[in-house]
Amino acid sequence: MNTVHRTLRRWAGKDFVWLAAALLTGTGLYFSGALAAETAFKIPPPAVDIAELTAGTTPATTAPGSQQTAVFAGGCFWGVQGVFQHTRGVIQAVSGYAGGKQETARYDQVTTDTTGHAESVQVTFDPAQVSYGQLLEVYFSVIHDPTQLNRQGPDVGTHYRSALFYTDAAQRQVAEKYIAQLDAAKVYRKKIVTQVTPLEGFFPAEAYHQDYATLHPESGYIIAFDLPKIANLKTMYPDRYRAEPQLVGRQSARLVKP
């Protein structure tokens, strides 16, 4: 089934995805517990955020109008992008690839699980409106299950792994401390497997992958796995939810190299 789904996603056509949904629904599998969107629940906020690490200073990155960038991987990038596009303070969320080389950053190669890439989303945000720690809270509670190794929902493979690609030492510290905090509190039944890795390059995905959750709300996959995540963001974090998504549109996604 994963092979069929991956092939349909490669076509990225809503009619193909609808066909898969119809076929799988007919067998009683598509909306079964094993294939439903990951369960979301409130978790403790990070005890340490960027502000605590920079206490007593006024770094330029937190000045009014400043921007920061972070990269998140947590399963299919359609849903990850969709949630962050509905998060207040996010300026742009771009689907793409991280963890491998530029020459293999193509969907047909990434899906072979031989490139080292993870489907990822580059999030540019205003730290005066939303902090990195608050984005992590959404990531760990709404976007995916961080205890699943190399899979989310029906998608299996290392390119669907849970990973945080940090752009500076502060992000690394906040991410590692938060994971340790959640593990110590036994928030999940199993230990978190999220990788915390330096960002060596982010490569935007093909145009047909951008804004996918918004452009294809009738897709069987989006209905089953991604719209529930956006709904959970609205319910669980109403102060962070934005009804109008911040779409990539015709803007050119930029290549990030720390």
Question: Where are the regions a protein language model picked out?
Answer:
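Flexible coil/turn and secondary-structure edge motifs
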Residues: 2-258
